[in-house]
Each structure stands twice: as C-alpha cells, then as structure tokens.
C-alpha cells in the first residue's frame, strides 16, 4: 500500500494513524506539501488538481487550512525553520503543539517480548 502523506501532514500528525497512515511505502513523506505542488506543476498535472483546496474530506465543507488556521505556505516555512534549520520562533508554538500531540502516530506499536 502506498501512502500519499507528505512531510507537512506527517510532522503535524494530520493523518489517521491506522487509516491513510497505514502503508508499506511513503514516497513523498520527505516533501512538504508546497514541494508536492511545485513538483505537480513541473509534471504538468492539471492546474485544477493543484489548485483544489486541501481537505481531509472528513465532513462537508472541511478544509485543512481553515482547521489549522494557517495556510500551507506559512506552515511549510515554519516547519522548515523548526525541523530543517533548528530555528524556533515563539509564534511556532501551535505547530510544535500539533507535532508533540501527534508523536504517538510516528512511533511503532509497542510489543511485549
């Protein structure tokens, strides 16, 4: 099973642990959402697909950026500052909270040996 989770969604825990997070390979997990959009443009993916408002599709009218209260350009810049450049700013607190609160999604299941 191939995942569509990107680095932005992975770091924020913005996926379902045993739903879209259950996979065998994650080819775009290292790419921020805005990087995926850039690559899609290079690959000549139809602009209507690239411009479609990101949504988990959990309910009618649900859109990621409204739920996160930030747009993905801002989110990706902040996440790159934090995780790629170790440059933490006070206004990144909400993103760090999402990262820490979703830590369990990035851990392997515990086993009793």
Locate the predicted segments by residue.
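ATP/NTP-dependent adenylation/nucleotidyl-transfer catalytic domains that generate, transfer
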Residues: 1, 5-113
């Amino acid at each position: 099973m191939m995942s569509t989770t990107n680095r932005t969604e992975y770091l924020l825990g913005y996926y379902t642990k045993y739903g879209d997070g259950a996979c065998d390979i994650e080819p775009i997990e290292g790419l921020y959402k805005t990087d995926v959009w850039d690559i899609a443009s290079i690959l000549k993916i139809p602009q209507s697909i690239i411009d479609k408002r990101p949504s988990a599709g959990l309910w009618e009218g649900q859109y990621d950026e409204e739920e996160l209260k930030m747009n993905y350009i801002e989110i990706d810049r902040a996440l790159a500052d934090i995780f790629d450049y170790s440059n933490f700013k006070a206004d990144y607190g909400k993103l760090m909270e999402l990262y820490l609160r979703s830590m369990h999604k990035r851990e392997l299941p515990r086993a009793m040996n």
